[in-house]
Amino acid sequence: MDGLPDAGKPPIAMKFGISTHLYHDQRLSREHLSAIAEAGFEAVELFATKSHFDYTDPAAINSLAQWLRETGLTLHSIHAPIWDVFGGTTGSSYSTAAADNAKRQAAVRQAEAALAIVRDIPASYMVVHLGTTDANNGENSRAAASRSLEEICQFAEPLGVRIAAEVIPNDLSSAHALVAMLERDFDGSTVGICLDFGHAHLMGDVADAIETAAEHLITTHVHDNRRRADEHLVPYRGTIDWPAALLMMQKIGYDGTYLMELAANGDPSAVLADAQRARQRFERALSE
């Protein structure tokens, strides 16, 4: 980040995007991207699940490139695979922090396969989960997580992509834990933090997580919940203190994209309309 804007300079231009997570239960289509663009959003994050978008299929990648050109959207980021089928109830799941090295390597290979999209479609970031939310299943090894992150960064650096470790509800991935790992094991040039507001809310105080991650914060996942489950609600539909959270984002001088990662809840078009209204509230709050 560039820090707080100097007095007399124009305000930071706010950028907003939507994750294709909104359509995660469907095969991604041009119509989905058109709806996002028509709702006034500038960017997308591709949720890389093979049942949603087959990132290993050259024809699918070519189609995505064409859809992005036609809709005027930018591919802001790619979410590294955590399953190969929506919902994770069938097929394979992937953990970059698996203690079993074969499982860990499988997760890294899938992340690299999804990241290879940027050879055809430019993107700035890949968002990576370190481990899983179940701390008792052998998937959350600190050493394995650090090794995986290093390997993915080595693959990403020549492609000009920065890796963002996501704040998720486990011991490896709180804002405090991620900062400790990055400052211990990485030089900061190719890896940072994706501040997931909803996940931070499940674990504690969102404003505190933002302040903790500040020097490493490079992208976001914006959604809400009622602190009972990871609901991926539109902002202001849960119990996050958004005025306090956005004030802290201003305080740390965040100048990146606010990327909404929302659940469809049966009606993606209604969610998009609600997201438009939330964006307007963000813009007003961040302009004060």
Regions found by a protein language model. Name each.
Residues 52-54, 82-84, 133-136, 169-173, ...:
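Short, small-residue-enriched loops and turns at beta-alpha junctions
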Residues 7, 29-30, 85-192:
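Active-site acidic/histidine proton-transfer and metal-coordination neighborhood
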Residues 43-44, 50, 78, 147-239:
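Acidic/histidine-rich catalytic cores of soluble enzymes
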Residues 36, 44, 68, 107, ...:
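Conserved, mostly hydrophobic/aromatic
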Residues 11, 70-73, 155-161, 184-190, ...:
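Short helix-capping segments at alpha-helix termini
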Residues 42, 74, 124, 218, ...:
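Short acidic/polar active-site loop segments enriched in Thr and Asp
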Residues 2-113, 119, 157, 215, ...:
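N-terminal pre-domain/capping segments
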Residues 20, 33, 55, 90, ...:
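Gly/Pro-rich active-site loop or hairpin
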